[in-house]
């Protein structure tokens, strides 16, 4: 099979729910990093892009009707470039990269764009149609996150625990204490604050211009979600609203956020044709299923699966980017893999607890951050992994070139 090279990777800043990026539609937001790829790689004939895969978890609002294609057109890509939207919930952006790489490895494409977008701020309310005439039983659902239009059999067989409730389940099953969760959350905030102060995250960010009425556009070039002043004492005072006597709080969980990320992938032939310098190659990707009630544990079997498929070991990973949906599940996964709670190479620049978790974008963000970190420390391999709602995990390995 051919190699699938990562040529470039760029993302927008991550905005808070209702924050600086909330005025930007998902399709417009998704276009921003695509446009940046085009500007940064001017030697490419963009009409030669074979396909574009973009992850998006919602697709109930302005991100409907194939947001990947919409964003591609808005970015100025030639109309000949097709695009499709992938939905593996939280793993969508990573799945897009892995499937783009597989397409190149199979020889079916030579040039691909992959990534993801999510505007959780702009997620709409939806209402289903009544099952019979004159019914008064219509329900309105907030599509920002979680279950809607639940299948009764799913509820009976697997439960419909909310995402925080699944984290409570993980904390209980794997004996993850509130104190350990808060300590993990604090480390995430501290590492992100240090990375931002050193300018490390700025290297992977393209600014977003947010239109303003009767004013110049607001230029957003910094992640909005981190709270650098967080203390352990503050975290300890937060309530546990998801379960009586529980341990999951707003402080040791990821945020509800907005953002977009895009990567350019190429075969060896197309990289040479357009004078592109490969930065990494996608070694492999794997997915795994777990019980929906403990969905946060998904990265553990997915990571083992991709390591087995690629013939690599966890000890060979110079960087590990583990999505911090919740501190409870991140700790359950790292401990199951035999890693210390404060492993220096696991989320060295912090993670989703500090940075935020725009669902369809996050997987692509992990790969982008891992690539930049590998280059900084001159490492070889990075493992990127994350949990997925309804009980899945996904993991992807890249090798720096």
Give the label of every model feature segment.
Residues 1-71, 75, 82, 166-178, ...:
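Conserved active-site "lid/cap" helical segment
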Residues 87-118, 171-200, 262-269, 335, ...:
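Active-site-proximal alpha-helical scaffold in enzymes
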Residues 24, 56-111, 144-147, 157-163, ...:
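Conserved catalytic cysteine-centered active-site region
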Residues 111-169:
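Flexible glycine-/small-residue-enriched beta->alpha junction loops
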Residues 1-24, 145, 230-297, 301, ...:
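Condensing-enzyme catalytic core mediating Claisen C-C bond formation in acyl metabolism
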Residues 54, 168, 204, 212-214, ...:
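Active-site pocket-lining segment
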Residues 11-12, 23, 27-32, 43, ...:
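N-terminal extracellular/periplasmic Venus flytrap/periplasmic-binding protein-like
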């Amino acid at each position: 099979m051919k190699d699938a090279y990562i040529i470039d990777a760029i993302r927008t800043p991550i905005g808070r729910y209702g924050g600086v990026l909330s005025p930007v539609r998902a399709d417009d937001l998704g276009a921003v990093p695509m446009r940046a790829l085009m500007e940064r790689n001017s030697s490419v004939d963009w009409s030669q892009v074979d396909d574009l895969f973009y992850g998006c978890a919602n697709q109930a609002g302005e991100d409907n009707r194939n947001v990947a294609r919409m964003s591609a057109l808005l970015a100025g890509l030639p109309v000949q470039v097709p695009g499709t939207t992938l939905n593996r919930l939280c793993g969508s952006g990573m799945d897009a990269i892995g499937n783009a790489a597989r397409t190149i490895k199979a020889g079916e494409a030579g040039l691909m764009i992959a990534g993801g977008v999510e505007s959780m701020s702009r997620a709409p309310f939806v209402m289903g149609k009544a099952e019979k005439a004159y019914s008064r039983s219509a329900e309105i659902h907030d599509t920002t996150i979680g279950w809607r239009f639940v299948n009764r059999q799913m509820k009976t067989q697997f439960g419909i625990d909310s995402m925080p409730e699944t984290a409570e389940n993980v904390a209980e099953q794997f004996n993850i204490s509130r104190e350990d969760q808060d300590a993990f959350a604090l480390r995430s905030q501290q590492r992100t604050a240090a990375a931002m102060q050193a300018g490390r995250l700025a290297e992977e960010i393209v600014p977003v211009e947010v239109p303003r009425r009767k004013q110049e556009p607001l230029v957003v070039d910094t992640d909005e979600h981190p709270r650098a002043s967080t203390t352990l004492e503050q975290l300890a005072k937060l309530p546990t609203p998801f379960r009586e006597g529980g341990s999951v709080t707003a402080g040791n969980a990821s945020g509800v956020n907005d953002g977009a990320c895009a990567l350019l992938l190429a075969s060896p032939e197309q990289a040479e044709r357009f004078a592109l310098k490969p930065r990494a190659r996608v070694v492999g990707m794997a997915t795994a299923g777990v019980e929906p009630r403990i969905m946060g544990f998904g990265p553990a079997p997915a990571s083992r699966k991709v390591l087995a498929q690629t013939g690599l070991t966890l000890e060979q990973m110079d960087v590990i980017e583990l999505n911090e949906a919740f501190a409870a599940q991140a700790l359950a996964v790292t401990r199951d893999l035999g890693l210390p709670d404060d492993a220096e190479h696991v989320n060295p620049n912090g993670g989703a607890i500090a940075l935020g978790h725009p669902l369809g974008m996050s997987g692509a963000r992990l790969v982008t951050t891992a690539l930049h970190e590998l280059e900084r420390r001159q490492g070889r391999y990075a493992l990127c992994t994350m949990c997925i709602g309804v009980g899945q995990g996904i993991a992807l390995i890249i090798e720096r070139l």
